[in-house]
Regions:
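Nucleic acid-binding interface residues in structured DNA/RNA-binding domains
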Residues: 4, 61-151
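Low-complexity, small/basic-enriched stretches
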Residues: 1-63, 131-151
């Protein structure tokens, strides 16, 4: 990934909005799906090229993308678990809780859902693959991302 820090955005007809990525020190710090990009967002970045290809149907799990997860440890653990859900598959919030070290699915359902909703980098931390809980991406975006992946 490019080491260029900044905000990058490109419009997606499939999502009917922009995909906006913020990068610092070679790591993704945020991903959002605004209807209008930040005024200083630039349209050219290798990650945006990959996202466009992905949205066009080219499989990409984005496993090599480094994401800066600056969240409390328990939320970070949940999001790190979500990163292990493979391209083209889905999981439930209960399954994510079961797979996350230190989480008890019967007691921590709320914690898992809060972590998913606080995801700073949807797509690269694929909360859209958790089919019964909302991530931080708009619901319509999550549905379209699952459709792209055939799940």
């Amino acid at each position: 990934m490019s080491q260029d820090a900044g905000i990058y955005a490109r419009e997606s007809a499939l999502l009917d909005r922009y995909v906006q990525v913020a990068v610092a020190q070679g790591r993704v710090i945020s991903v959002s799906f605004p209807t209008e990009p930040e005024p200083d967002a630039r349209p050219e970045h290798a990650l945006l090229d990959r996202i466009v290809a992905y949205l066009g149907g080219e499989p990409d799990g984005f496993d090599d993308v480094q994401v800066a997860l600056t969240l409390p440890t328990d939320r970070r653990a949940v999001l790190e678990t979500v990163q292990t859900v493979p391209y083209g598959t889905t999981a439930t919030a209960d399954q994510v809780a079961q797979m996350t070290p230190g989480y008890d699915p019967e007691e921590d359902d709320t914690g898992v859902r809060e972590a998913l909703a606080a995801n700073p980098a949807p797509l690269f931390v694929p909360t859209h693959r958790v089919r019964d809980a909302a991530g931080s991406e708009p619901a319509g975006v999550a549905k379209r991302l699952r459709a792209v992946e055939g799940s």
